[in-house]
Regions:
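Extracytoplasmic beta-strand/coil segments of soluble accessory domains associated
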Residues: 81-125
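Short strand-turn segments of transmembrane beta-barrel domains in outer membranes
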Residues: 117-118, 155-157, 168-199, 207-208, ...
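Short acidic/polar hinge/loop motifs at secondary-structure boundaries
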Residues: 125-153, 172, 489
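Transmembrane beta-barrel wall of Gram-negative outer-membrane proteins
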Residues: 187-212, 217-254, 276-299, 340, ...
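Membrane-embedded beta-barrel scaffold of Gram-negative outer-membrane proteins
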Residues: 196-197, 202, 299-315, 454-469, ...
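Surface-exposed extracellular loop regions of Gram-negative outer-membrane beta-barrel proteins
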Residues: 257, 261-264, 356-370, 412-433, ...
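Gram-negative outer-membrane beta-barrel transporters
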Residues: 340, 395-402, 410, 510-520, ...
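C-terminal beta-signal and adjacent terminal beta-strands/loops
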Residues: 616-624, 642-692
Length: 692
């Protein structure tokens, strides 16, 4: 019998409310998550992530969510999870400082290559090279000053390949015309300070911010800087849109606190068991998108790009506390051509990426013969990927549309070991933890595709979709081996997905409902011998709901909820498990979570005041594959308010955890004990924005 955590949060009433609202709605057109319900309904929402060009969001035969610029400005995110709380099916688990782990139609995935399950991108280009992802890579994106954040859920479209397994997060830089001329100063609890500014001139816009935070736990905190330069220009018959973005993070990291429900102890919450921990990360990337009309109804686009990333951090979560430095540099090109006849649209493209990366791990102090001091790993990898894709959409009738697409992709790795082959330990070690495989070359050939059928009326879209996604192994899964594993004989992970969805608008109500089933095969995992192997199977089923309701000219309500089951679908000898785990919930996969925002805007009543009360919840979840240890879940209340002191000056307040709940942002069970990244107590940030 499968053990299941009992329901602990009063979410049932919230889901019931949303369900009743949907049940009483007359079907209509598409919704946008966040507060799009407050926007002018005459302005049609578009999504660019699905095809690399603007598509009417209402008609897309795939599940999506978007958080627009006005939402981002009101949220004023200090961390990425404050944005993705508003996306149905998404939970970004907050670590310490700016660290995070992503859940998108999935559990919160951990491990060397877990980040490969998600595509995180800026303007459609992966923040990091697909074979060199990092679980914390969202901290590279300039979310505060983005023009929009778009999320596609599940294996979505063929313009994305490796890593677009569970979904795509695409952060769009604001167009020059969209960039606000303003300066913003913020100050808050525990020495939080942020200065941000943005402005545009002619065809160029610049946005920049700098943040300093003193930290809640002892000897923690961070300094971070981000900047985005945007170009929009026309040259002869070409339209040119480009961006240059960089970020720098200097973080003093607080480690897990230990002990069952220690996050409820006020003294324990402030402790930092790892005052020596740190993370320094630097990133920069740029692209130019050249596009021009082709044969009247078509378009040609060429988008060359480059990226550079470097990060050094202490592995405080491991007892021997090694230090890792990883970096990579890339150049690439996205090329696409599209056209349209009366009933048939098509596009075809090619993507090329070349990356040179490296990883160096060393340990300062001797821990044991099996975890010695000195160099553990030192290697370089040259990676090349080449992909071609095509997609067609056929308007069968005025209301029925059929979509189909396919993508083939090859990934090649040329690995060079720069230190001694074999174990990093002395010959007398009984079970050396670190093994350096000999230099080698690997290649992977994969494909992805989708079929969709959709029905459209003036105010409703219904769709059914089948899709396949994949991810090639990450370089760390192949070349950072342990416990005597001489070679990682692993293959690409694949996922097959079926999805049904309906979205619409009825008067003041918007809604979006999607149900999905996904089966993953050849899942890469670490077995009980600490070998990286393929062959696991997992199943993912869920229901997602997003709602927006304009109650009257002042009050509005938005909300999202997700109910899902993520389980092991094969009997594997997973590290940390005992006996059989087939049928168990995958650890760190709450059955339900979501958020509701109640908003008031008194501008129509002649009062320059707006406010938002937010309730968010995460249900309890298991911490281990045997489903023996669990976290109880939590609920939080947050408040945001803005007061226009004058036409050019606005005072803002962001207050989080209003009830001062003791909770964990992330819970874990490892090395024989409960471990928690502690949630912060009640906090407040005051801001002053000057429009120029």
């Amino acid at each position: 019998m499968i053990n299941q955590p009992a329901s602990s949060t009063p979410i049932v009433s919230a889901l019931a409310f949303l369900a009743v609202a949907i049940g009483t709605a007359v079907p209509t057109s598409a919704q946008q998550s966040g507060t799009q319900a407050n926007e002018d309904r005459e302005i049609e929402t578009v999504i660019v992530t699905a095809s690399r060009r603007a598509d009417p969001a209402a008609a897309l035969p795939t599940a999506w969510s978007a958080v627009d610029q006005s939402d981002l400005q009101r949220i004023a995110p200090q961390h990425s999870n404050q944005v993705f709380n508003r996306v149905a099916g998404s939970w970004v688990s907050r670590g310490n400082g700016q660290e995070s782990l992503i859940s998108l139609r999935s559990p919160v995935l951990t491990g060397a290559g877990s980040c490969g399950a998600f595509m995180t991108a800026q303007d459609g280009i992966s923040l990091r090279s697909p074979g060199f992802c990092n679980v914390n890579q969202l901290f590279d994106a300039n979310l505060l000053q983005a023009g929009k954040v778009e999320v596609l859920k599940g294996p979505a479209t063929v313009v994305f390949g490796s890593n677009a397994l569970h979904g795509i997060i695409n952060v769009l830089t604001p167009a020059v015309a969209q960039t606000r001329n303003q300066v913003r100063v913020e100050a808050g609890s525990r020495d939080y300070y942020r200065l941000s500014a943005s402005g545009s001139f002619d065809s160029i816009a610049l946005s920049a911010q700098t943040t300093r935070y003193g930290g809640y736990q002892d000897e923690s905190g961070y300094k971070q800087q981000k900047a985005t330069l945007r170009l929009d220009h026309e040259w002869q018959s070409w339209r040119v849109a480009g961006a240059l973005e960089g970020s720098n993070l200097d973080q003093e990291t607080a480690g897990y606190i230990r002990g069952f429900e220690s996050y409820q102890d006020d003294d324990a919450r402030e402790e930092n068991p790892n005052p020596e921990a740190y993370r320094d990360a630097w990133s920069a990337r740029g692209h130019l998108d050249f596009s021009r009309d082709w044969r009247g109804t078509g378009e040609i686009s060429l988008k060359p790009y480059w990226r550079s990333n470097s990060m050094t951090f202490l592995q405080h979560y491991l007892p021997w506390k090694a230090t890792e430095t990883n970096q990579h540099r890339s150049i690439g090109l996205q090329a696409m051509i599209n056209g349209r006849s009366d009933r048939l649209g098509w596009r075809a493209g090619m993507d090329v990426d070349h990356t040179e990366g490296s990883l160096f791990e060393t340990q300062a102090e001797f821990f044991s013969p099996n975890q010695p001091d000195g160099v553990h790993y030192d290697y370089e990898v040259d990676a090349d990927s080449l992909a071609a894709f095509t997609h067609v959409d056929w308007s069968i009738t005025e209301r029925w549309q059929f979509d189909a697409g396919i993508r083939i992709e090859e990934t090649r790795y040329d690995y060079q070991n720069l230190t001694g082959d074999g174990p990093a330990c002395a010959p007398s070690a009984s079970a050396c933890r670190f093994y350096r495989p000999a230099s080698q070359k690997d290649s992977f050939n994969d494909w992805t595709g989708n079929l969709a059928l959709s029905h459209h009326t003036a105010n409703r879209t219904v769709f059914a979709k089948a899709a396949r996604g994949f991810r090639a192994p990450q370089t760390t899964e192949l070349y950072r081996l342990q416990s005597g594993q001489t070679i990682a004989d692993i293959d690409s992970e694949t996922v097959d997905s079926l999805e049904l969805g309906i979205r619409g608008v009825a008067g003041g109500l918007t809604y979006d409902v999607a149900a999905y089933w996904m089966a993953k095969e050849d899942v890469i995992f670490q077995d009980r011998d600490r070998y990286n192997v393929s062959g696991a199977e997992t199943e993912h089923r869920g229901l997602e709901l997003t709602l927006g309701w304009i109650i009257n000219d002042v009050w509005s309500l938005t909300g999202n909820g997700s109910y899902a089951r993520h389980r092991y679908d094969s009997d594997i000898e997973l590290l940390g498990s005992r006996g059989t785990i087939e049928g168990n919930d995958i650890d760190t996969s709450p059955r339900h979570f979501g958020s509701i925002q109640l908003m008031a805007d008194f501008a129509s009543r002649g009062q320059p005041l707006s406010a938002e009360l937010e309730w968010l919840w995460v249900a309890k979840y298991w911490l281990d594959p045997n489903n023996q240890h669990e976290y109880a879940g939590h609920e939080l209340l947050n408040l945001r308010a803005a007061w226009d002191l004058s036409p050019s000056l606005t005072l803002t307040l962001v207050a989080t955890n209003l009830l001062d709940e003791g909770y964990a942002e992330r819970a874990d069970f490892g090395f024989g004990s409960y471990r928690y990244f502690v949630g912060e107590p009640r906090s407040a940030v005051l801001g002053l924005t000057l429009a120029l």
